[in-house]
Amino acid sequence: MVKGKRGMAIVIALIVLTCHLLFSAQTVHAEDSEGTQIAATLFVLKNASEVSNAKIHWAPVNGANEYELYRSENNEPFILLQTLTGTTMDDYDLTIGSTYRYQVKAYGGSSLITSAVSPEYAPHTLPDNLTTFDNTNQSTLNLPNELKVGDTYYRFNFVPKSSGGFGQMIQQTSTDDSTYGNDKVVLSYTDHPDLANSKFEGINVLYHAPTNKFVFWAHYENSTDYTLARVSVASATPGENFTFHKSFRPEGNESRDISIFKDDDDSAYLISTANNNSDTILYKLTSDWLDVENQVSVIYQDQHRELPKVIKKDGVYYLFSSQAAGWYPSIPMYSSASSIDGEWSELRTIGNTSTFSAQSGSVMRVKPNTGNQVIMVAYRWMFGWAGTENGTTEERLLPVTFSNGYAFYDYFDQVLYSANDDVVVPVQDGKLLSQGKPATAQTATGTNPANYANDGNYQTEWIGTGSSWPHWWKVDLGSVQEIHNVQISWWMQKGSEGFYKYKIETSTDNVNWTEALDRTNNTSYGFTSDTLSSPARYVRIQMESAKLHNNPSNWYTPRLWEVKVFGADEE
Protein backbone atom coordinates (compact mmCIF):
# COMPACT_ATOMS: atom_id res chain seq x y z
CA MET A 1 0.00 0.00 0.00
CA VAL A 2 1.34 3.40 -0.92
CA LYS A 3 0.66 6.70 0.80
CA GLY A 4 -2.90 6.04 1.90
CA LYS A 5 -4.61 6.20 -1.46
CA ARG A 6 -6.99 3.35 -0.61
CA GLY A 7 -7.90 5.03 2.64
CA MET A 8 -8.63 8.30 0.88
CA ALA A 9 -10.99 6.50 -1.49
CA ILE A 10 -12.78 4.76 1.36
CA VAL A 11 -13.31 7.97 3.29
CA ILE A 12 -14.96 9.66 0.33
CA ALA A 13 -16.89 6.60 -0.88
CA LEU A 14 -19.64 4.70 0.84
CA ILE A 15 -19.00 1.22 2.06
CA VAL A 16 -21.83 0.16 -0.22
CA LEU A 17 -19.40 -0.14 -3.11
CA THR A 18 -17.08 -2.53 -1.34
CA CYS A 19 -20.01 -4.77 -0.59
CA HIS A 20 -20.32 -5.40 -4.33
CA LEU A 21 -16.96 -7.13 -4.18
CA LEU A 22 -18.41 -10.17 -2.44
CA PHE A 23 -19.41 -12.45 -5.25
CA SER A 24 -21.44 -15.54 -5.51
CA ALA A 25 -20.32 -18.36 -7.66
CA GLN A 26 -21.21 -21.10 -10.15
CA THR A 27 -16.51 -25.58 -13.17
CA VAL A 28 -14.70 -25.09 -16.30
CA HIS A 29 -10.99 -25.58 -16.59
CA ALA A 30 -8.54 -22.76 -17.30
CA GLU A 31 -6.35 -23.14 -20.37
CA ASP A 32 -2.57 -23.33 -20.15
CA SER A 33 -0.22 -20.65 -21.49
CA GLU A 34 0.10 -22.38 -24.89
CA GLY A 35 -3.63 -22.23 -25.53
CA THR A 36 -5.96 -19.36 -26.24
CA GLN A 37 -9.56 -18.37 -25.71
CA ILE A 38 -11.78 -15.88 -27.50
CA ALA A 39 -14.68 -13.71 -26.36
CA ALA A 40 -16.63 -10.72 -27.62
CA THR A 41 -18.27 -7.60 -26.22
CA LEU A 42 -21.42 -6.42 -28.00
CA PHE A 43 -21.56 -2.63 -28.33
CA VAL A 44 -23.62 0.13 -29.89
CA LEU A 45 -22.32 2.86 -32.16
CA LYS A 46 -22.96 6.36 -30.89
CA ASN A 47 -26.48 7.63 -31.70
CA ALA A 48 -27.55 4.19 -32.98
CA SER A 49 -30.38 2.06 -31.59
CA GLU A 50 -29.06 -1.45 -32.24
CA VAL A 51 -26.44 -3.29 -30.21
CA SER A 52 -25.23 -4.97 -33.38
CA ASN A 53 -21.44 -4.76 -33.25
CA ALA A 54 -18.88 -7.02 -31.60
CA LYS A 55 -15.43 -6.23 -30.26
CA ILE A 56 -13.64 -9.56 -30.33
CA HIS A 57 -10.57 -10.34 -28.19
CA TRP A 58 -8.42 -13.43 -27.97
CA ALA A 59 -5.43 -14.31 -25.85
CA PRO A 60 -2.00 -14.06 -27.50
CA VAL A 61 -0.30 -17.37 -28.22
CA ASN A 62 3.40 -18.00 -27.72
CA GLY A 63 5.08 -18.48 -31.10
CA ALA A 64 2.13 -17.21 -33.16
CA ASN A 65 2.79 -14.53 -35.76
CA GLU A 66 -0.62 -14.57 -37.41
CA TYR A 67 -4.24 -15.19 -36.51
CA GLU A 68 -7.25 -16.10 -38.62
CA LEU A 69 -10.61 -14.90 -37.34
CA TYR A 70 -13.80 -16.70 -38.38
CA ARG A 71 -17.51 -16.10 -37.75
CA SER A 72 -20.49 -18.43 -37.65
CA GLU A 73 -24.05 -17.10 -37.92
CA ASN A 74 -26.92 -19.22 -36.63
CA ASN A 75 -24.63 -22.25 -36.26
CA GLU A 76 -23.75 -22.26 -39.95
CA PRO A 77 -20.15 -23.16 -40.95
CA PHE A 78 -17.48 -20.67 -39.95
CA ILE A 79 -16.37 -18.19 -42.61
CA LEU A 80 -13.06 -16.34 -42.62
CA LEU A 81 -13.37 -12.66 -41.69
CA GLN A 82 -9.75 -11.56 -41.64
CA THR A 83 -6.14 -12.62 -41.22
CA LEU A 84 -4.26 -10.33 -38.87
CA THR A 85 -1.35 -10.06 -36.45
CA GLY A 86 -3.20 -8.42 -33.56
CA THR A 87 -5.41 -9.89 -30.86
CA THR A 88 -8.63 -7.93 -31.39
CA MET A 89 -11.02 -6.96 -34.16
CA ASP A 90 -14.37 -5.20 -34.53
CA ASP A 91 -17.24 -6.85 -36.41
CA TYR A 92 -20.02 -4.44 -37.43
CA ASP A 93 -23.65 -4.47 -38.59
CA LEU A 94 -24.68 -7.84 -37.21
CA THR A 95 -28.29 -8.93 -37.69
CA ILE A 96 -30.86 -8.64 -34.93
CA GLY A 97 -32.46 -12.06 -34.43
CA SER A 98 -29.34 -13.99 -35.41
CA THR A 99 -26.76 -15.55 -33.12
CA TYR A 100 -23.01 -15.48 -33.66
CA ARG A 101 -19.91 -17.34 -32.58
CA TYR A 102 -16.30 -16.56 -33.41
CA GLN A 103 -13.30 -18.80 -33.94
CA VAL A 104 -9.62 -17.87 -33.87
CA LYS A 105 -6.77 -19.94 -35.28
CA ALA A 106 -3.21 -19.13 -34.25
CA TYR A 107 -0.37 -19.85 -36.68
CA GLY A 108 3.39 -19.94 -36.33
CA GLY A 109 4.46 -19.60 -39.94
CA SER A 110 2.25 -22.06 -41.81
CA SER A 111 1.71 -24.33 -38.82
CA LEU A 112 -1.50 -24.22 -36.82
CA ILE A 113 -0.61 -23.90 -33.12
CA THR A 114 -4.04 -23.79 -31.49
CA SER A 115 -7.60 -22.58 -31.96
CA ALA A 116 -10.60 -21.60 -29.88
CA VAL A 117 -14.32 -20.90 -30.29
CA SER A 118 -16.19 -18.17 -28.44
CA PRO A 119 -19.48 -18.34 -26.56
CA GLU A 120 -22.61 -17.43 -28.51
CA TYR A 121 -23.74 -13.81 -28.83
CA ALA A 122 -27.12 -12.36 -29.81
CA PRO A 123 -27.34 -8.76 -31.11
CA HIS A 124 -30.36 -6.86 -29.85
CA THR A 125 -32.04 -3.50 -29.84
CA LEU A 126 -30.84 -0.97 -27.29
CA PRO A 127 -33.01 -1.17 -24.16
CA ASP A 128 -34.70 1.92 -22.79
CA ASN A 129 -33.95 3.63 -19.49
CA LEU A 130 -30.27 2.78 -19.23
CA THR A 131 -27.94 4.81 -17.03
CA THR A 132 -24.84 6.35 -18.62
CA PHE A 133 -21.42 6.10 -17.05
CA ASP A 134 -19.13 8.56 -18.83
CA ASN A 135 -15.46 7.62 -18.74
CA THR A 136 -14.50 11.14 -19.85
CA ASN A 137 -16.50 13.18 -17.33
CA GLN A 138 -17.38 13.08 -13.64
CA SER A 139 -19.62 10.03 -13.19
CA THR A 140 -21.03 7.99 -10.34
CA LEU A 141 -21.74 4.27 -10.53
CA ASN A 142 -25.10 3.50 -8.90
CA LEU A 143 -25.63 -0.17 -8.07
CA PRO A 144 -28.02 -1.81 -5.59
CA ASN A 145 -26.90 -2.08 -1.98
CA GLU A 146 -26.36 -5.72 -1.03
CA LEU A 147 -26.41 -5.06 2.72
CA LYS A 148 -30.11 -5.70 3.24
CA VAL A 149 -31.42 -7.50 6.32
CA GLY A 150 -35.18 -7.93 6.51
CA ASP A 151 -36.69 -4.78 5.05
CA THR A 152 -33.76 -2.53 5.95
CA TYR A 153 -30.75 -1.51 3.89
CA TYR A 154 -27.54 -0.59 5.70
CA ARG A 155 -24.55 1.44 4.64
CA PHE A 156 -21.53 2.78 6.50
CA ASN A 157 -19.46 5.94 6.28
CA PHE A 158 -16.10 6.52 7.92
CA VAL A 159 -15.29 9.88 9.48
CA PRO A 160 -11.68 10.76 10.39
CA LYS A 161 -10.60 12.54 13.55
CA SER A 162 -9.61 16.18 13.13
CA SER A 163 -6.03 15.15 13.87
CA GLY A 164 -6.17 12.36 11.27
CA GLY A 165 -6.83 8.65 11.42
CA PHE A 166 -10.01 6.73 12.14
CA GLY A 167 -12.65 8.62 14.09
CA GLN A 168 -16.08 7.05 13.74
CA MET A 169 -17.99 4.49 11.72
CA ILE A 170 -21.45 5.89 10.95
CA GLN A 171 -24.36 3.59 10.12
CA GLN A 172 -27.18 4.82 7.87
CA THR A 173 -30.36 2.93 7.04
CA SER A 174 -33.03 2.99 4.35
CA THR A 175 -36.20 1.15 3.42
CA ASP A 176 -35.93 1.86 -0.31
CA ASP A 177 -32.15 1.94 -1.01
CA SER A 178 -32.60 5.54 -2.08
CA THR A 179 -33.11 7.81 0.91
CA TYR A 180 -30.70 7.11 3.77
CA GLY A 181 -30.72 8.56 7.25
CA ASN A 182 -30.95 7.62 10.93
CA ASP A 183 -27.23 8.26 11.38
CA LYS A 184 -25.76 6.27 14.23
CA VAL A 185 -22.19 5.91 15.47
CA VAL A 186 -21.54 2.15 15.59
CA LEU A 187 -17.76 2.20 16.12
CA SER A 188 -15.50 4.89 17.59
CA TYR A 189 -11.79 5.38 18.12
CA THR A 190 -12.51 5.26 21.87
CA ASP A 191 -13.99 1.74 21.74
CA HIS A 192 -10.73 -0.22 21.75
CA PRO A 193 -7.04 0.56 22.40
CA ASP A 194 -6.16 -0.47 18.83
CA LEU A 195 -8.51 2.23 17.48
CA ALA A 196 -7.04 5.20 19.33
CA ASN A 197 -4.40 5.93 16.70
CA SER A 198 -5.35 3.95 13.62
CA LYS A 199 -6.53 4.03 10.04
CA PHE A 200 -8.42 1.55 7.86
CA GLU A 201 -8.01 0.86 4.16
CA GLY A 202 -9.48 -1.73 1.82
CA ILE A 203 -12.64 -1.95 3.93
CA ASN A 204 -15.00 -4.91 3.41
CA VAL A 205 -18.37 -5.31 5.16
CA LEU A 206 -20.25 -8.59 4.68
CA TYR A 207 -23.47 -10.01 6.09
CA HIS A 208 -23.00 -13.44 7.68
CA ALA A 209 -26.52 -14.89 7.68
CA PRO A 210 -25.93 -17.95 9.91
CA THR A 211 -24.94 -15.72 12.84
CA ASN A 212 -26.98 -12.65 11.79
CA LYS A 213 -23.85 -10.50 11.93
CA PHE A 214 -22.22 -7.83 9.84
CA VAL A 215 -18.52 -8.70 9.61
CA PHE A 216 -15.94 -5.99 9.00
CA TRP A 217 -12.43 -6.62 7.61
CA ALA A 218 -9.84 -3.99 6.70
CA HIS A 219 -6.17 -3.30 6.25
CA TYR A 220 -5.08 -1.80 9.58
CA GLU A 221 -2.28 0.73 10.22
CA ASN A 222 -1.50 3.42 12.73
CA SER A 223 -2.61 6.88 11.66
CA THR A 224 0.83 8.22 10.74
CA ASP A 225 2.62 5.55 8.70
CA TYR A 226 2.53 2.04 7.25
CA THR A 227 4.71 0.08 9.66
CA LEU A 228 2.07 -2.26 11.14
CA ALA A 229 0.81 -4.12 8.04
CA ARG A 230 -2.06 -5.88 9.83
CA VAL A 231 -5.65 -6.84 9.19
CA SER A 232 -8.49 -5.91 11.53
CA VAL A 233 -11.85 -7.52 12.20
CA ALA A 234 -15.07 -6.35 13.87
CA SER A 235 -18.68 -7.52 13.91
CA ALA A 236 -22.18 -6.38 14.86
CA THR A 237 -25.77 -7.50 14.88
CA PRO A 238 -27.54 -5.33 12.27
CA GLY A 239 -28.56 -2.04 13.84
CA GLU A 240 -26.32 -2.45 16.88
CA ASN A 241 -22.81 -1.25 17.70
CA PHE A 242 -19.78 -3.05 16.31
CA THR A 243 -17.40 -4.97 18.54
CA PHE A 244 -13.79 -4.52 17.48
CA HIS A 245 -12.15 -7.91 17.94
CA LYS A 246 -8.49 -7.41 17.08
CA SER A 247 -5.80 -6.33 14.66
CA PHE A 248 -3.19 -8.90 13.69
CA ARG A 249 -0.86 -10.28 11.04
CA PRO A 250 -2.43 -13.41 9.52
CA GLU A 251 -0.19 -16.42 10.17
CA GLY A 252 2.45 -13.87 11.18
CA ASN A 253 2.65 -12.42 7.65
CA GLU A 254 2.51 -8.75 6.70
CA SER A 255 -0.85 -7.76 5.28
CA ARG A 256 -1.39 -4.64 3.18
CA ASP A 257 -3.89 -4.50 0.31
CA ILE A 258 -6.73 -6.92 1.06
CA SER A 259 -10.10 -8.11 -0.14
CA ILE A 260 -12.61 -10.71 1.03
CA PHE A 261 -14.16 -13.25 -1.35
CA LYS A 262 -17.30 -15.23 -0.42
CA ASP A 263 -17.78 -18.51 -2.28
CA ASP A 264 -21.02 -20.36 -3.15
CA ASP A 265 -20.91 -22.50 -0.03
CA ASP A 266 -20.63 -19.45 2.26
CA SER A 267 -16.96 -20.10 2.91
CA ALA A 268 -14.93 -16.89 2.81
CA TYR A 269 -11.33 -16.08 1.96
CA LEU A 270 -8.90 -13.27 2.68
CA ILE A 271 -6.66 -12.25 -0.23
CA SER A 272 -3.75 -10.21 1.06
CA THR A 273 -0.52 -8.68 -0.24
CA ALA A 274 2.55 -9.26 1.92
CA ASN A 275 6.27 -8.46 2.08
CA ASN A 276 5.81 -4.89 0.87
CA ASN A 277 3.34 -6.04 -1.78
CA SER A 278 5.81 -8.46 -3.38
CA ASP A 279 3.67 -11.52 -2.53
CA THR A 280 -0.06 -12.28 -2.70
CA ILE A 281 -1.37 -14.78 -0.14
CA LEU A 282 -4.75 -16.55 0.11
CA TYR A 283 -6.20 -17.45 3.53
CA LYS A 284 -9.40 -19.27 4.43
CA LEU A 285 -11.55 -17.67 7.14
CA THR A 286 -13.25 -19.49 9.98
CA SER A 287 -16.89 -20.47 9.51
CA ASP A 288 -18.07 -17.34 11.34
CA TRP A 289 -15.70 -15.19 9.21
CA LEU A 290 -14.17 -13.62 12.33
CA ASP A 291 -10.64 -15.04 12.07
CA VAL A 292 -8.15 -16.70 9.75
CA GLU A 293 -8.41 -20.49 9.80
CA ASN A 294 -5.34 -21.28 7.70
CA GLN A 295 -3.12 -20.14 4.86
CA VAL A 296 -4.26 -21.76 1.62
CA SER A 297 -1.50 -20.73 -0.79
CA VAL A 298 0.96 -18.09 -1.91
CA ILE A 299 -0.59 -17.20 -5.25
CA TYR A 300 2.16 -14.82 -6.37
CA GLN A 301 5.71 -14.49 -5.10
CA ASP A 302 7.94 -11.50 -5.92
CA GLN A 303 5.36 -10.16 -8.42
CA HIS A 304 4.60 -6.82 -6.71
CA ARG A 305 0.86 -6.81 -7.31
CA GLU A 306 -1.66 -4.60 -5.48
CA LEU A 307 -5.42 -4.45 -4.91
CA PRO A 308 -6.26 -8.14 -5.40
CA LYS A 309 -9.91 -8.86 -6.27
CA VAL A 310 -11.48 -12.26 -6.93
CA ILE A 311 -14.67 -13.06 -8.81
CA LYS A 312 -16.10 -16.45 -9.76
CA LYS A 313 -17.60 -16.66 -13.23
CA ASP A 314 -18.96 -19.79 -14.91
CA GLY A 315 -17.23 -21.97 -12.36
CA VAL A 316 -13.79 -20.37 -12.74
CA TYR A 317 -12.07 -18.13 -10.19
CA TYR A 318 -10.40 -14.98 -11.54
CA LEU A 319 -7.95 -12.84 -9.57
CA PHE A 320 -7.41 -9.30 -10.88
CA SER A 321 -4.64 -7.03 -9.60
CA SER A 322 -2.64 -3.90 -10.39
CA GLN A 323 1.09 -3.45 -10.66
CA ALA A 324 2.54 -1.71 -7.61
CA ALA A 325 3.22 1.80 -8.94
CA GLY A 326 2.22 4.26 -6.25
CA TRP A 327 -0.37 6.75 -7.46
CA TYR A 328 0.36 6.23 -11.15
CA PRO A 329 -1.53 4.20 -13.76
CA SER A 330 -0.06 0.71 -13.95
CA ILE A 331 -0.15 -2.61 -15.78
CA PRO A 332 -3.28 -4.70 -15.05
CA MET A 333 -3.05 -8.48 -14.96
CA TYR A 334 -5.12 -11.46 -13.86
CA SER A 335 -4.86 -15.18 -13.13
CA SER A 336 -7.50 -17.91 -13.05
CA ALA A 337 -8.07 -21.25 -11.33
CA SER A 338 -10.68 -24.00 -11.50
CA SER A 339 -10.47 -24.44 -7.72
CA ILE A 340 -9.81 -21.67 -5.24
CA ASP A 341 -7.42 -23.87 -3.27
CA GLY A 342 -5.80 -25.30 -6.41
CA GLU A 343 -3.15 -24.09 -8.83
CA TRP A 344 -3.53 -20.63 -10.34
CA SER A 345 -2.52 -19.81 -13.90
CA GLU A 346 0.37 -17.55 -14.78
CA LEU A 347 -0.25 -13.81 -14.69
CA ARG A 348 -1.87 -12.70 -17.97
CA THR A 349 -2.16 -9.30 -19.58
CA ILE A 350 -5.54 -7.63 -20.02
CA GLY A 351 -6.50 -4.28 -21.53
CA ASN A 352 -3.65 -1.90 -22.29
CA THR A 353 -0.45 -1.28 -20.35
CA SER A 354 -1.86 1.53 -18.17
CA THR A 355 -5.39 0.24 -17.40
CA PHE A 356 -6.47 3.13 -19.64
CA SER A 357 -4.88 5.74 -17.34
CA ALA A 358 -6.03 4.02 -14.15
CA GLN A 359 -5.24 1.08 -11.88
CA SER A 360 -6.98 -2.28 -11.72
CA GLY A 361 -9.71 -1.94 -9.12
CA SER A 362 -12.99 -3.58 -8.14
CA VAL A 363 -14.46 -6.28 -10.35
CA MET A 364 -18.16 -6.90 -9.79
CA ARG A 365 -21.45 -8.01 -11.22
CA VAL A 366 -23.74 -5.18 -12.28
CA LYS A 367 -26.65 -7.15 -10.85
CA PRO A 368 -25.29 -8.33 -7.51
CA ASN A 369 -24.97 -12.06 -6.85
CA THR A 370 -27.09 -13.39 -9.72
CA GLY A 371 -26.06 -11.21 -12.66
CA ASN A 372 -24.10 -12.28 -15.72
CA GLN A 373 -22.67 -8.88 -16.73
CA VAL A 374 -19.33 -8.02 -15.09
CA ILE A 375 -17.47 -4.72 -14.95
CA MET A 376 -14.04 -3.58 -13.85
CA VAL A 377 -14.16 -0.35 -11.86
CA ALA A 378 -10.62 0.91 -12.44
CA TYR A 379 -9.39 3.56 -10.02
CA ARG A 380 -7.86 6.83 -11.17
CA TRP A 381 -5.73 8.16 -8.33
CA MET A 382 -4.23 11.64 -8.14
CA PHE A 383 -1.98 11.18 -11.15
CA GLY A 384 -4.53 9.15 -13.06
CA TRP A 385 -6.79 12.10 -13.64
CA ALA A 386 -4.27 14.82 -12.71
CA GLY A 387 -6.70 16.77 -10.57
CA THR A 388 -10.42 17.27 -10.93
CA GLU A 389 -10.12 20.61 -12.68
CA ASN A 390 -10.28 18.91 -16.06
CA GLY A 391 -13.53 17.19 -15.10
CA THR A 392 -12.50 13.65 -15.92
CA THR A 393 -13.92 10.79 -13.94
CA GLU A 394 -12.15 9.38 -10.90
CA GLU A 395 -13.04 5.86 -12.03
CA ARG A 396 -13.14 4.10 -15.37
CA LEU A 397 -15.78 1.51 -16.12
CA LEU A 398 -14.55 -1.37 -18.30
CA PRO A 399 -16.96 -4.17 -19.33
CA VAL A 400 -15.35 -7.59 -18.78
CA THR A 401 -15.92 -10.73 -20.85
CA PHE A 402 -14.81 -14.25 -19.96
CA SER A 403 -14.13 -17.54 -21.71
CA ASN A 404 -12.83 -20.71 -20.03
CA GLY A 405 -10.31 -19.13 -17.70
CA TYR A 406 -9.47 -16.08 -19.81
CA ALA A 407 -10.73 -12.54 -19.32
CA PHE A 408 -10.80 -9.47 -21.57
CA TYR A 409 -11.73 -5.80 -21.36
CA ASP A 410 -11.32 -2.69 -23.48
CA TYR A 411 -12.03 1.02 -23.25
CA PHE A 412 -15.17 2.89 -24.35
CA ASP A 413 -15.90 6.57 -23.67
CA GLN A 414 -19.40 5.72 -22.42
CA VAL A 415 -20.94 2.62 -20.87
CA LEU A 416 -24.72 2.20 -20.52
CA TYR A 417 -26.02 -0.08 -17.80
CA SER A 418 -29.00 -1.29 -15.79
CA ALA A 419 -28.47 -3.27 -12.61
CA ASN A 420 -32.09 -4.40 -12.37
CA ASP A 421 -32.08 -5.80 -15.91
CA ASP A 422 -28.46 -7.02 -15.84
CA VAL A 423 -27.52 -4.97 -18.92
CA VAL A 424 -24.17 -3.46 -19.90
CA VAL A 425 -23.81 -1.79 -23.31
CA PRO A 426 -20.65 0.13 -24.19
CA VAL A 427 -20.87 2.97 -26.71
CA GLN A 428 -18.26 3.53 -29.43
CA ASP A 429 -17.97 6.80 -31.35
CA GLY A 430 -17.64 5.40 -34.85
CA LYS A 431 -15.98 2.42 -36.47
CA LEU A 432 -12.33 1.58 -35.94
CA LEU A 433 -10.68 2.88 -39.11
CA SER A 434 -6.97 2.61 -38.42
CA GLN A 435 -6.23 -0.99 -37.48
CA GLY A 436 -3.93 -2.70 -39.97
CA LYS A 437 -3.71 0.33 -42.25
CA PRO A 438 -0.31 1.52 -43.60
CA ALA A 439 1.63 3.42 -40.96
CA THR A 440 4.85 5.41 -41.10
CA ALA A 441 6.89 7.37 -38.60
CA GLN A 442 9.66 9.94 -38.53
CA THR A 443 12.00 7.13 -37.46
CA ALA A 444 11.59 3.51 -36.40
CA THR A 445 13.76 0.70 -35.18
CA GLY A 446 13.95 -2.42 -37.30
CA THR A 447 12.33 -4.57 -34.64
CA ASN A 448 9.54 -2.12 -33.73
CA PRO A 449 8.17 -0.62 -36.95
CA ALA A 450 5.46 2.01 -37.22
CA ASN A 451 2.69 -0.52 -37.93
CA TYR A 452 3.14 -2.02 -34.44
CA ALA A 453 1.20 1.01 -33.16
CA ASN A 454 -1.97 0.14 -35.07
CA ASP A 455 -1.86 -3.64 -35.31
CA GLY A 456 -4.65 -4.32 -32.81
CA ASN A 457 -2.31 -5.48 -30.06
CA TYR A 458 -1.86 -3.38 -26.92
CA GLN A 459 1.35 -5.31 -26.09
CA THR A 460 3.36 -4.40 -29.22
CA GLU A 461 4.82 -0.95 -29.80
CA TRP A 462 6.43 1.34 -32.35
CA ILE A 463 9.78 2.71 -31.17
CA GLY A 464 11.61 5.62 -32.76
CA THR A 465 15.38 5.89 -32.94
CA GLY A 466 17.20 8.14 -30.52
CA SER A 467 15.47 10.71 -28.35
CA SER A 468 14.88 13.63 -30.70
CA TRP A 469 11.72 15.65 -30.12
CA PRO A 470 9.26 16.57 -31.64
CA HIS A 471 8.53 13.27 -33.38
CA TRP A 472 5.62 12.11 -35.51
CA TRP A 473 3.72 8.90 -36.28
CA LYS A 474 1.17 8.69 -39.12
CA VAL A 475 -1.50 6.34 -40.47
CA ASP A 476 -3.09 6.23 -43.94
CA LEU A 477 -6.78 5.29 -43.62
CA GLY A 478 -6.99 4.50 -47.35
CA SER A 479 -9.75 7.01 -48.14
CA VAL A 480 -11.23 10.17 -46.67
CA GLN A 481 -13.16 9.46 -43.48
CA GLU A 482 -14.90 11.64 -40.90
CA ILE A 483 -12.80 11.33 -37.75
CA HIS A 484 -14.65 11.28 -34.40
CA ASN A 485 -12.31 9.87 -31.78
CA VAL A 486 -8.60 9.13 -31.37
CA GLN A 487 -7.39 6.88 -28.55
CA ILE A 488 -3.68 6.64 -27.79
CA SER A 489 -1.96 4.18 -25.48
CA TRP A 490 1.26 5.91 -24.42
CA TRP A 491 4.50 4.32 -23.30
CA MET A 492 5.64 4.99 -19.71
CA GLN A 493 8.63 3.91 -17.66
CA LYS A 494 7.66 2.55 -14.25
CA GLY A 495 9.20 4.79 -11.61
CA SER A 496 9.71 7.61 -14.12
CA GLU A 497 6.16 7.92 -15.43
CA GLY A 498 5.54 10.75 -17.84
CA PHE A 499 2.70 12.27 -19.84
CA TYR A 500 2.91 13.57 -23.39
CA LYS A 501 2.32 16.96 -24.99
CA TYR A 502 0.99 16.34 -28.47
CA LYS A 503 -1.13 17.48 -31.40
CA ILE A 504 -3.40 15.54 -33.73
CA GLU A 505 -3.06 16.64 -37.35
CA THR A 506 -5.15 15.57 -40.33
CA SER A 507 -4.84 15.69 -44.11
CA THR A 508 -6.82 14.53 -47.11
CA ASP A 509 -3.82 14.47 -49.48
CA ASN A 510 -0.71 13.91 -47.30
CA VAL A 511 0.53 17.36 -48.36
CA ASN A 512 -1.67 19.96 -46.73
CA TRP A 513 -2.11 19.44 -42.99
CA THR A 514 -4.63 20.81 -40.49
CA GLU A 515 -4.16 20.94 -36.74
CA ALA A 516 -7.31 19.11 -35.70
CA LEU A 517 -6.58 19.15 -31.97
CA ASP A 518 -3.96 20.76 -29.74
CA ARG A 519 -3.27 18.58 -26.70
CA THR A 520 -0.10 20.25 -25.50
CA ASN A 521 -2.02 20.85 -22.27
CA ASN A 522 -2.41 17.11 -21.65
CA THR A 523 -1.65 15.81 -18.15
CA SER A 524 -3.04 12.26 -18.38
CA TYR A 525 -0.61 9.40 -17.95
CA GLY A 526 -0.62 6.30 -20.11
CA PHE A 527 -3.79 6.79 -22.16
CA THR A 528 -5.82 9.55 -23.81
CA SER A 529 -9.14 9.58 -25.63
CA ASP A 530 -9.86 12.68 -27.71
CA THR A 531 -13.08 13.72 -29.43
CA LEU A 532 -12.77 15.73 -32.63
CA SER A 533 -14.49 16.25 -35.96
CA SER A 534 -12.32 16.35 -39.05
CA PRO A 535 -12.38 14.81 -42.54
CA ALA A 536 -9.12 12.98 -43.12
CA ARG A 537 -7.39 10.22 -44.99
CA TYR A 538 -4.17 10.73 -43.05
CA VAL A 539 -3.93 11.15 -39.29
CA ARG A 540 -0.64 12.24 -37.74
CA ILE A 541 0.28 12.23 -34.06
CA GLN A 542 2.78 15.04 -33.54
CA MET A 543 4.52 14.33 -30.23
CA GLU A 544 5.98 17.59 -28.93
CA SER A 545 7.55 16.30 -25.70
CA ALA A 546 7.13 14.06 -22.68
CA LYS A 547 7.10 15.41 -19.14
CA LEU A 548 8.50 13.03 -16.53
CA HIS A 549 7.30 13.39 -12.96
CA ASN A 550 10.77 12.96 -11.46
CA ASN A 551 13.11 14.44 -14.04
CA PRO A 552 13.09 17.87 -15.71
CA SER A 553 14.84 16.34 -18.71
CA ASN A 554 12.91 14.28 -21.24
CA TRP A 555 15.04 11.20 -21.81
CA TYR A 556 12.19 9.16 -23.31
CA THR A 557 12.57 7.65 -26.76
CA PRO A 558 9.48 8.47 -28.89
CA ARG A 559 7.26 5.40 -28.93
CA LEU A 560 3.59 4.38 -28.94
CA TRP A 561 1.82 1.23 -27.82
CA GLU A 562 -1.37 1.68 -29.85
CA VAL A 563 -3.28 4.36 -31.77
CA LYS A 564 -6.96 3.86 -32.58
CA VAL A 565 -8.78 6.21 -34.95
CA PHE A 566 -12.58 5.98 -34.97
CA GLY A 567 -15.06 7.58 -37.35
CA ALA A 568 -17.34 7.09 -40.34
CA ASP A 569 -17.02 7.15 -44.12
CA GLU A 570 -17.44 10.68 -45.44
CA GLU A 571 -20.14 10.87 -48.06
Which residues does each predicted region cover?
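Aromatic, loop-rich ligand-recognition surfaces of beta-strand-rich domains
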Residues: 59, 455-515, 521-571
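Short beta-strand segments within Ig-like beta-sandwich modules, predominantly Fibronectin type-III
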Residues: 80-86, 517-521
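Extracellular low-complexity, O-glycosylation-prone stalks/linkers
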Residues: 63-80, 506
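Pro/Thr/Ser/Gly-rich low-complexity, intrinsically disordered linker/stalk tracts
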Residues: 32-63, 96, 111-125
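Beta-strand-rich modules
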Residues: 91-111
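Juxtadomain low-complexity/linker regions and immediately adjacent membrane-anchoring helices
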Residues: 2-5, 12-17, 408-410, 414-455, ...
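Beta-rich carbohydrate-recognition and catalytic domains
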Residues: 56-59, 79, 116-202, 206-256, ...
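Sec-dependent signal peptide cleavage junction
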Residues: 20-35
